[in-house]
Amino acid sequence: MQKRNILGIFVGLIIGLYTVLGMSLFTFINLKFNSVYYAQHIPHKEGTDPDVIMLMENMGWAYTPEIEDISYDDDGMYAITRNKGTKTSILGLSGDTLYFSSASGDDYLLNRNFSVQHAFDEHYHKIKYNQRKVQKEIRETVQPVIDAQPKPLINLQWLFNLIYQSRFN
């Protein structure tokens, strides 16, 4: 009788452990795959653009649809390239730095809070820049990808907000 009770407790603990691990894995994957959708709906202060940041940070997880004139690079540095006629703009992420090459040929280095740290022209001379204009150009580059993000089957917006609220405010 004693062995049966111990075996029952052991089996119950194993089943409980697998259930908790499975739910944790599902939650992690859900938050990664749907991070761009959740970031679109999180309250944030002006100028932070959490949807663009989440798209770049989780590009390996997020939905990246085939869209005309947009290509993706995910080997080494995550990047999104958008061709508009003869003009090309590129937004890339390497480590903690966002890199944006505008269609006009100017290059910008941004931190993960989406603020410009350095700006250069095509000859690598420092240039003056307008933060809002740069952010608008970046948004134009990636907006079709952001618009294509599907709604999650199980919405964990509350958990995403809990985790990322302090970062985007």
Task: Give a label for each model feature.
Residues I14-T97:
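N-terminal export/targeting and maturation segments
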